[in-house]
Amino acid sequence: MCPCCGAEYKSIVKFNLMDKEKERLFSEFSPVSTENWKNKIVEDLKGADYDKKMIWRTSEGFNVNPFYRKEDIPSGCGAEKPGEFPYTRGTKSDNNWLVRQDIDLPSAQEANARARKILGEGVDSLAFKVKGKLVTPEYIPALLEGIDAEKVELNFNVCVGKVVDFTHLLVEYLRQCGFNLEKVRGSIGYDPIAKEMLAGKNLDNYTEVIKALVEATSALPQYRCIAVNSCKLNNAGAYITQELGYALAWGNEYLNAATEAGVPVDAVAKNIKFNMGISSNFFMEIAKFRAARMLWAKIVEQYSPECKCACKMALHAETSEFNLTLFDAYVNMLRTQTEAMSAAIAGVDSITVTPYDAVYEAPTDFALRIAKNQQLILKHESHLGKVTDPAGGSYYIESLTASIAAEAWKLFLAVEEEGGFRKAVKEGKVQAAVEEAGNSRRTALARRKEILLGTNQYPNFSELSGGKRPLEKGCGCGCNNEAPAAATLSIRRLGEEFEQLRIATEASGKRPKAFMLTIGNLAMRQARAQFSCNFLATAGYEVIDNLGFKSVEEGVAAAMEAKADIVVLCSSDDEYAEYAVPAFKAIGDKAIFIVAGAPACSEELKAAGIENFIHVRVNVLETLKALNAKLGI
């Protein structure tokens, strides 16, 4: 039993182990060595290079093998039970995470009405955004009227300039209402480094604020007043190991600064909450959260806390905004569903699912309901809340956990050796590194090495934006409006440039027609027409596919009759030498002529004046921008 929090950890499942003398299943199969498995793969590759074909070189800095065996798991990795140090498998013996929903409304009365409504629909954690001008003695009673603070987690994102005032008002309100302060749960998300990173502000007094907050919340043992919002890095496009490595350095910055200022390490560690993002990389995100708990526990352990439970990471997870899209927005539900599932399997403490329409509007009641139900399905239909660390013991997940931990630890040490996280932020190093990662991913998207369904691949051909435009998000607190004193973190969604391209096409008032001149080999012309339709529709063009033409002349005549702005010749590589030049000459300057593919005769075609080719190796975004320019868009 923990002397500080009174928690007692026991395994909630009893296993009846098979007697060694009993017959084992599949005993007729002899063991297969790793070498034999690899030899079989090499044989099936029929001469292809094993490393190039089968080993995934991740952006996170390590390789992923095609198969894993017991010997791939580092010694001792995941050997503890859930709820045991270093908490790789979870900080508790169950997996009953909290379903959180954010509330950002202009008045206390509106926010209260929303909160009371969703609390009756399965939500058990609320997050209120509180602007500085709202921090008054009257605000909190109006905001929390009718809400039992002992039964729901209450989280507040408060203006940094008003956070201490707000905290005193909150504690006083809870006392006056007669709540058992030891049962009240929640957080007050004071994260000065995030403010410095996002707005370029200078908050040199933050250690004094932390001391004041820790003292103010001392009567609330289950409240956390310091936040590490590494979800901001995720939303800016950071790699998984970047987010984790920086998050650890971020938390350690607060831990070190506060303890040096005289705050006991237990008090500081138990007041830090990590708010991390969840990317769409399903298995790696499971591993990231497991690695996060383990590494943070070992960091806190170095400060020699009196209580082991100070080493537990309080971990909230938010689905990523980086990969959300304006077009085909319902696909956002699928993205956030798999993200929420990975966090649930990883055993985080609470989850926020971003509503599918958050990119372009204040979420509707329908979108909020779906976002909440996405978690409830995982809990009550998939029963993930009944299973603790189901990924534990998986050779793949355990190996990923170790690999991500190793790379994140390297980054953590590098930041510490150069003076700590805040120094790196003040010098713009963190912002630059994350910007580089985000740009790398945008380049991958432009080349379709990374896919956003409905944006750069398989767009909805008939969809129009309907006036939807990306929402501009800001702090909105009204404090510290001076110009940034340092570099700021650029948060841009992955698909923004494709969306801008498509919106520009719509705004031009003319929707270009792209005509597929399909001829020759049936299989190749169909494949290339499908590729070209998807390629050009991502810019919002109207695409006209065809079954096939008997001659170039017939195809060109049909294209002219359709008033095509673009004509795409779709055939086989061997036949382009025959069809391309006659088609190009017949079309002349009546339309833009494109060859679908990169045939061996490309140089001859270029010599004849053909300059537009689309294929899997081109930069889709730059090609479409160039076409828009030629079309006067």
Which sequence ranges carry the predicted segments?
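Short glycine/threonine-rich loop-to-helix capping motif typified by GTGT followed
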Residues: A238-L244, S279-A291, S320-M333, E361-A371, ...
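Glycine-rich anion/phosphate-binding loop at the beta-strand->alpha-helix junction
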Residues: L248-G251, N275-P363, I370-A371
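Catalytic alpha/beta active-site cores
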Residues: F15-N281, K312-H316, A344, S350, ...
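Conserved, mostly hydrophobic/aromatic
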Residues: G61, G122, G178, W296, ...
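A glycine-rich phosphate-binding loop feature that marks nucleotide/adenosyl-phosphate handling sites
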Residues: I55-N63, G189-I193, N229-N235, A269-S279, ...
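Short, Lys/Arg-enriched N-terminal segments with co-localized hydrophobic residues
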Residues: P3, E8-L17
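Intrinsic disorder at enzyme termini
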Residues: D19-E35, K53-W56, F62-Y87, D349, ...
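Mobile "lid/hinge" segments at catalytic clefts and subdomain interfaces of large enzymes
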Residues: P221-A258, L334-F412
